[in-house]
């Protein structure tokens, strides 16, 4: 257990220092390739002359098959890597576990991608900001003004504090890199298949629901950790308002989980997030999150990242403390 704690800490440090360099092949991209491969072969109507109801049921069943195939493949490969590494010697096992933990987390990657939006807005203006933010959000960015671009970037940091940092960290603390990568597989399936359009309405439904389930508890833990971060993060954050907006607006989203950390971030920064957005040429009505106590500005992207980092350090500290307590009882 002691070696697992060392690997867990080392993986977090590697994530903070190295992040996700594009020249290093990332396992999540391999998972995405598997999902794409299965999607092309399973999500089709060819050969079916059934009623629409039966066809939709078939799509749903195929989506379930895809999900379990991806989860099993991810689980099996992760186990094999660790077994082989630890069979060489203890040091190889710890190194493998640390590297896998590093690639599960996305703390620095989230900061780098969102700060590109900040840099673009600060140096080149709104058009450059639109191009930068289009790389990290799914909405139509061509209609966004500077406030809209900033809001999209802040929302991405807030939501992905849970999905990309805290949730995978918690699952890795509980079940090692194997469970961490299984979580990443579920999260990747949701991001690729969880659309409410004709192609994925039924085929991607199981993946989307599974993602809601695995994120239900971590999203709420993330929110409370972020509230704590707002209280200890200095005068730029309003901890009391973060808690107030969280209690009021944490369900102002179609997903039961997404507004948990978004509401905390909105309250901590004293800005208003969410609201209507354009996706694939269609206006999607969304509730607002937070109160517009001041106008949002591109500096809020930097503040949101600071809040995310403090939250990540809190989670790492508490996770290591919890793992150490378990070790002491063994």
Where are these regions (language model features)?
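Hydrophobic alpha-helical transmembrane segments
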Residues: 1-181, 186, 194-330
